């Protein structure tokens, strides 16, 4: 029992207002079911191996799948991550290896959504924007062979107001810099060597960019995040957002 994850009263109170109303047959206890889902994602378990204390494993899986499809976890993350205005933003991307159970559809001729083969292994790519404290504000998923620019283009329209945005030289593009400036955000991005006119940037400020890398490290401590087992991209990104909610927002 001591090894089981269990939502506290305060944690449950922060997310419960976003739960869908139950209709018809009463659903399983929200605290235990959500705690069980978190336990499975963090430990990297198969659903059928979930501890019995959380209830039937099918209940855990069905709740996770149904609420992922309905966007419940996405709404919780979006609401909690947008309650204040960050002074600083950081953007980056990381690869997440796809387990054979997630990639197996490719062998049947139906390629799984958001899984690609950039260099050998099949994987997905997580694009993220975090604040100056290393807390994720925006998350999106693409196939592993997608460029950083694709992720930036997907996230840029949703950037919250901020003073600065830090990014590595992979994000050095005129369109991205111009978009940030239009939003009142100052880009702190080292220029590429082949840029005709080099652009100055705040090197002292840029040293803080490790926060986004640390954020990815904490997410990958969750085994079902570090390795993708979910065939459907909407359930995998839901798992990532659940991890982000638990680690930073409740």
How should these model regions be labeled?
Residues 1-250:
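Short alpha-helical elements
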């Amino acid at each position: 029992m001591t090894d089981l994850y269990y939502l506290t009263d305060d944690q449950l109170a922060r997310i419960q207002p976003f739960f869908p109303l139950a209709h018809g047959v009463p659903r399983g206890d929200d605290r235990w079911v959500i705690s069980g889902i978190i336990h499975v994602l963090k430990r990297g378990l198969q659903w059928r191996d979930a501890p019995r204390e959380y209830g039937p494993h099918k209940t855990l899986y069905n709740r996770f799948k149904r609420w992922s499809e309905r966007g419940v976890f996405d709404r919780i993350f979006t609401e909690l991550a947008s309650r204040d205005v960050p002074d600083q933003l950081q953007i980056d991307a990381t690869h997440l290896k796809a387990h054979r159970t997630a990639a197996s559809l490719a062998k049947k001729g139906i390629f799984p959504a958001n899984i690609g083969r950039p260099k050998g292994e099949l994987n997905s790519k997580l694009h993220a924007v975090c604040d100056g404290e290393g807390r994720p504000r925006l998350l999106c998923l693409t196939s592993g062979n997608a460029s950083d620019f694709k992720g930036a283009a997907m996230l840029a329209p949703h950037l919250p107001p901020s003073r600065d945005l830090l990014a590595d030289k992979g994000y050095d593009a005129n369109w991205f810099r111009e978009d940030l400036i239009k939003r009142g955000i100052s880009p702190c991005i080292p220029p590429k060597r082949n840029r005709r006119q080099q652009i100055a940037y705040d090197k002292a400020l840029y040293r803080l960019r490790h926060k986004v890398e640390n954020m990815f490290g904490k997410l990958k401590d969750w085994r079902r995040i570090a390795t993708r087992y979910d065939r459907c991209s909407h359930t995998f990104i839901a798992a990532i957002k659940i991890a982000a909610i638990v680690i930073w927002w409740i």
